[in-house]
Amino acid sequence: ALPIPINSNKSKKKEFIIFNHSPDQRIILIKTKKNQTSTDNEKNGASFYNFVKSNLLTNFTFFESNISETQIKNKSFIEEFVHGMQLKSYEFNKYKSKKEMTDMNVNIVFNKKIPVKIKNNRFSSLLEGTNFTKDLVSEPGNILHPDEYAKRILQLKKIGLKIKVYNEKDLKKLGMGALLGVGQGSVRGSYLVTMEWNGNKSKNKPLAFVGKGVCFDTGGYSLKPARFMEDMTYDMAGSAAVVGLMKTLALRKAKINAVGVVGLVENMVSGNAQRPGDIVKSYSGKTIEVLNTDAEGRLVLADALTFTEKKFKPKFIIDLATLTGAIIVSLGSEYGGLFSNDDKLSEQLLEAGEKVDEKLWRMPLHKNFDKLMNSKNADMQNINYVGGAGSTTAAQFLQRFIIALVVALGHALGPRVAAIATAERLPQVVL
């Protein structure tokens, strides 16, 4: 018989109970459901991490022989459980003079053999890519400006990614007036960075991922309110997700061809900053009247999307961006908004989101919205001043910069990244 439990988690569910086994050993019972998904296992692991951390426990051994028959059928149970612990253990404390020690030693005994440390498993590369994304998003704007960001991406060459950085001189030569216009008020440079992973030697079209990388967004002369402006370091989260994805693919030696493209800028106020009413010429040749300098992300993505399509001729393009506050009004922080011109791609993205509990909701695209973005002075304007459909008109704007209609395009517009702090486990992909 087990001794009387000395502690349990405060939750009514009582997922964990600790028993004293000996002066230096304790047994922890973990409650699980009958038919747990991989995400359920990760959530259990995340909750377990919080539990053992609060009880100051740092060394664990999982015994495969003690796993219930229900869970032993899932051969990945322990790996998924520990992955949830690892995701939840993330902490950005780089700039704290006193750091809380959170290291935990986790072992596993398979078939009563010697304990094996869980270090390199099938989730290791995913964890590295995820944490790299989180590190990028967490850096303050004075540290991770476009110049520094481009340098950090270049470091990924050592894991096999083919990387090219286009600086302002290159972008001017290419004619990327939309992207350059956003960054012209900053003393920092503006860049377009491409990352290629060729894991499949066939000549299959690559999968393309494009990310918005506004390292800090003041709103420009369409200035944002002072309150919460510090959160605008998160306006590069879409690009960070793309960079983390490309790192994961390279570490996994994934058998696919993929390309990641990110536009890196700072949207600042200065004597050289873009003015409301300016007209810029995009890489596509289409002109844009900039009525609002705080609708800048779509200008960065416009050039990045056209460039990605023309240069890489991908099977599809998915862009990730913290593009509009309007999507939060529509969906809150539980769902990311999905806009797509391809039903099959949409179904795949929605299904993937459900599986990892990072849910997407498909929003409408329709040619009737185009008239809201038409300009009297240019081919289009960058904002809808009529009111309403803010996220849809932003996506409709971006769709104009896909030249060939055969390219499937998906836009994932995410809520404020700060919302991830309340998640049961920290998300693996930040939108």
Where are these regions (language model features)?
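Short amphipathic alpha-helical segment within the helicase RecA-like ATPase core
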Residues: A1-G213
